[in-house]
Amino acid sequence: MKIIIGGKTFDAVLEDNAAAKKLAEKLPLEISMTELNGNEKYFRFNERFPSNDSRFATIHAGDLLLWSSNTVVLFYKTFSSGYSYTRLGKILNPAGLPAAAGNGNILVRFEK
């Protein structure tokens, strides 16, 4: 999968689970993601995804996770966390991701 942010393309892999398969069915997909906490961008769908949440002690830059069964979150910084998510996938090489993500809301394109 490719994740395109501001003209920069990142290679990513999806997990082998029901939530990631549902996301893959929506590709190609272009969404406006909202900035949160200086470390993530999120988009809330109007539908629920299958979820199998587990607690993440550390979130890594490039993690693509599902929160609360309907919110896709792309993390662009690594930090400690106590929240639970379902893993959707990850960017293979997140170098340059913080710069591409910037400080505000962004348009993100997901492609096969």
For each of these PLM feature ranges, what is it?
Residues 2-5, 25-28, 52, 105-112:
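N-terminal non-globular leader segments, chiefly Sec-dependent signal peptides
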Residues 75-91:
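Short, compositionally biased
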